[in-house]
């Protein structure tokens, strides 16, 4: 029995299966409010140092300032990305990516697919990269980036990050002009739409982000998360993963303050630098930790390679 057709759920499963076949481990989304898939610890920590990584995962993302009370057909404060991170990147990674679009019935021979230069930067993560936006018929659907620096550290080797904008791709696949009309899933001709699931949340979260969040409460939360992160970083045996989570929570609070326009331009820059200082400290200590362990994933890759050579 065919239970689903051209829907949002199907889009996710196609990408998961495709990248699994390309050798990626499929991870689960980080269970914290973050602004992009890049903030997931699999990407942030995985791109530090020489150890290889092949990972893919869906990530729910929040950008409070982008909320439009559930009234804008393509602007959301909560949305989904599908993230792929590979280190070192294969030489034919762009073709591998284009093949994934083909599985989504997006054929470059039929549609106008362009790689438009757009170097990427994330100041709070101390990260930047050389990259492109991928446009489908004039609409951005993917960010394609070769990381040069993460946590203020030079990437050796570089990692490639591919970030699919799932809502935009789904709108193309389903020929919808309003994100809330997207079919999320269907079973026996019963359809659940994106709006059925998320439109009320967009209304309420937008009200909170722009009107009802307590600014003093947010300032206090930021300070407490910052202090907690510092404490965990500076332990004799630092809790780096936990500290990074506290930094992400502080970062979300910063985004809420930004949505409320509670920060002057100078204050905003100061908060960015405070977050960046913490992520840099985590990155440096994490690199040293992995180094002291002998970068074990490097050895694991060599062991797998040696076994494959013996079999062949």
Curated annotation (Swiss-Prot):
GO terms for cellular component: cytosol. Its EC number is 6.1.1.14. It is found in: Cytoplasm. GO terms for biological process: glycyl-tRNA aminoacylation. Its main location: cytoplasm. GO terms for molecular function: ATP binding; glycine-tRNA ligase activity. HAMAP family: Gly_tRNA_synth_alpha (MF_00254). PANTHER family: GLYCINE--TRNA LIGASE, CHLOROPLASTIC_MITOCHONDRIAL 2 (PTHR30075:SF2), GLYCYL-TRNA SYNTHETASE (PTHR30075). Belongs to the class-II aminoacyl-tRNA synthetase family. This is Glycine--tRNA ligase alpha subunit.
């Amino acid at each position: 029995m065919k239970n689903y057709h051209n829907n949002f759920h199907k889009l996710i499963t196609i990408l998961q299966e495709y990248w699994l076949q390309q050798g990626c481990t499929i991870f689960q989304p980080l269970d914290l409010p973050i602004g992009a898939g890049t903030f997931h610890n699999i990407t942030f920590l995985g791109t530090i140092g020489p150890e290889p990584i092949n990972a893919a995962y869906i990530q729910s993302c929040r950008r409070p300032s982008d909320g439009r009370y559930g009234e804008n057909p393509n602007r959301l404060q909560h949305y989904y990305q599908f993230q792929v991170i590979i280190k070192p990147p294969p030489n034919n990674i762009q073709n591998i990516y284009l093949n994934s679009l083909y599985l989504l019935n997006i054929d470059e021979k039929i549609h106008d697919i362009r790689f438009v230069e757009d170097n990427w930067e994330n100041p709070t993560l101390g990260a930047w990269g050389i990259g492109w936006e991928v446009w489908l018929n004039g609409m951005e659907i993917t960010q394609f980036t070769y990381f040069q620096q993460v946590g203020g550290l030079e990437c050796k080797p570089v990692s490639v990050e591919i970030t699919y904008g799932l809502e935009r791709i789904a709108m193309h696949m389903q020929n919808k002009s309003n994100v809330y009309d997207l079919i999320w899933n269907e079973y026996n001709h019963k359809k659940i739409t994106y709006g059925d699931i998320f439109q009320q949340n967009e209304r309420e979260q937008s009200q909170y982000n722009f009107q009802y969040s307590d600014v003093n409460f947010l300032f206090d939360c930021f300070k407490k998360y910052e202090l907690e992160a510092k404490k965990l970083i500076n332990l004799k045996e630092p809790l780096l993963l936990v500290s990074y989570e506290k930094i992400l929570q502080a970062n979300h609070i910063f985004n809420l303050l930004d949505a409320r326009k509670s920060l002057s331009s100078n204050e905003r820059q100061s908060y960015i630098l405070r977050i960046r200082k913490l992520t840099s400290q985590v990155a440096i200590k994490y690199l040293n930790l992995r180094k002291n362990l002998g970068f074990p994933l490097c050895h694991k890759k060599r062991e797998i390679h040696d076994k494959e050579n013996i079999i062949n």
